[in-house]
């Protein structure tokens, strides 16, 4: 570092910072300039007197609990001049005995903490800053996630405040071996990231690998939270649409994954937890499998797997059979077209693929009061008149309706869109190359799954490849609870 003046320095990153002095005016002059207090209306500083010493309190308007701060300031009013300690550490022990109190000697960490909501107190004669954590964030209440709903089980879900989310997990795992490491990423955002795992159960090499990748992330801000972080810590194979991580907004699912030896990453400002390593079986698995008896849970799991597979293969298989009607057995003759086609089947299917996505986007951006009218217009008016006008055949509408509903049989949007992309590829290959295109499209789709890898470097479809019969049985059949200690083999 290069000295600029006795108390201002240049960091290795090229930014100026200050080592605090025992002169309050010098500290305030530097900080007021660095924080642009003349322009930032929400950066507040108050000059006060503690006994016979001048002091200054910095805080962010909207991030501070007014009642907590008021109690602290009221306590300062009773301090006498003879009772002032000689150093900041003694002052914090004597007059700030409760709460999270820290001491900082330079402006780098102090500014980051201040902008995250921590109040900072400077006292003339002390060369350190006292940080007082009495912050509060604007937050919504804990409620059931809109996407990860269950038929039975807890109704709480993660919110956008990191400490609330860690508390929801800690409430379920009251074990000192539950480790929650705090990391930061983003040169401008300094986003807090919590890495949660069970000591002795999670893979130590994987923990170190993830920690190192997060610490070495070179990004200005995690503007998209988990997705931004995922792309940073797993930069390879972006062209493969199958998700490398499982995302969940349920604390019970996250806690169960931690107990199985997985690692859960929570990002501040995001209500989703990133669970890793995750195979395709982990992503398809849902909480309902364990909130019902083993037989019911097994049925739900197998149904979800079958429906997800059908959502990818149904329309390409039907298109292939329509192009080769001689392959249709007698008992399946009813699947043939009842009316002639005005538009080739492959174009009907592709148009409906994009039309359904358009309706989905419209539903997301439609006010709640208009959602029902939109559904009526889309489902009845457009569907019925599209068939009557000759744009689409009724069979095409039927099979695409099934595929649309089947996409919602599992909770992962990422997996749903990955299967959609594979379905479109198989459709196009089938339309161009007929049976051989159908076979090639299926081979390509399954290669995209087979050659995918988790962040731990293991097979994406373990225990199917490599084959492990006991683990494969657990993936398809829901066994009795509780599970044995240890990881899940990913």
Describe the role of every protein-language-model region:
Residues 272, 278-426:
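Transmembrane alpha-helical segments that form the functional core of multipass membrane systems
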Residues 1-317, 321, 327, 449-490:
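Membrane-embedded alpha-helical signal segments
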Residues 174, 215, 360, 387, ...:
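Short polybasic/polar patches that bind polyanions
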Residues 394-396, 400-490:
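Hydrophobic alpha-helical transmembrane segments of membrane transport and translocation systems
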